[in-house]
């Protein structure tokens, strides 16, 4: 019986720590803050398409709700805006970003960064679709519905 209880506690402990290990980090793995600052100084020139697309998604996953405005506002938003406006992200990456951000519009308020920055970045994703359509009509409608639902809950 003691072993069963001990095993149960170990299992619960493992479950409790699993999300922390699965959480995305900011700065993303493989990039230091200094490297991201250097990338910004180089006007976001990242010539490896796969690495650029992976970084864009990693920034969204890890930095969107970061309380550091230098990471969230400057690194995340400026990089994504630059790459989206320059049509430097694949359709697959843009859809993955939208898929990551859309549920965040309905997330609990937290520190107050996640929901508004999800909306801000989604506006850039939607703009990219307006310039060069890549979403299906159904996907575009889903994004519109989620955005409207978010905006009706905003109290300032």
Describe each model-derived feature in a short phrase.
Residues 23-56:
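Extreme N-terminal leader/anchor segments
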Residues 44-50, 83-94, 126-140:
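Flexible loop/turn segments at the boundaries of HEAT repeats in alpha-solenoid HEAT proteins
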Residues 52-59, 71, 79, 89, ...:
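Structural recognition of alpha-solenoid helical scaffolds
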Residues 67-69, 110-111:
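Short inter-helical turns and helix N-cap capping residues of alpha-solenoid HEAT/ARM repeat scaffolds
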Residues 70-86, 116-128:
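Non-membrane alpha-helical segments in proteins
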């Amino acid at each position: 019986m003691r072993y069963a209880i001990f095993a149960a506690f170990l299992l619960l402990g493992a479950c409790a720590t699993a999300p922390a290990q699965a959480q995305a980090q900011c700065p993303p793995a493989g990039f230091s803050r200094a490297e991201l600052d250097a990338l910004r100084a180089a006007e976001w020139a990242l010539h490896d398409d796969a690495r650029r697309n992976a970084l864009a998604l990693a920034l969204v996953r890890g930095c969107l709700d970061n309380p550091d405005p230098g990471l969230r506002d400057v690194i995340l938003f400026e990089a994504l805006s630059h790459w989206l406006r320059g049509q430097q992200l694949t359709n697959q990456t843009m859809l993955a970003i939208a898929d990551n951000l859309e549920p965040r519009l309905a997330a609990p308020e937290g520190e107050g960064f996640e929901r508004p920055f999800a909306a801000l970045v989604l506006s850039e994703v939607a703009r990219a679709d307006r310039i060069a359509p890549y979403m299906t009509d159904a996907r575009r409608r889903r994004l519109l519905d989620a955005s409207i639902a978010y905006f009706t809950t905003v109290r300032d």
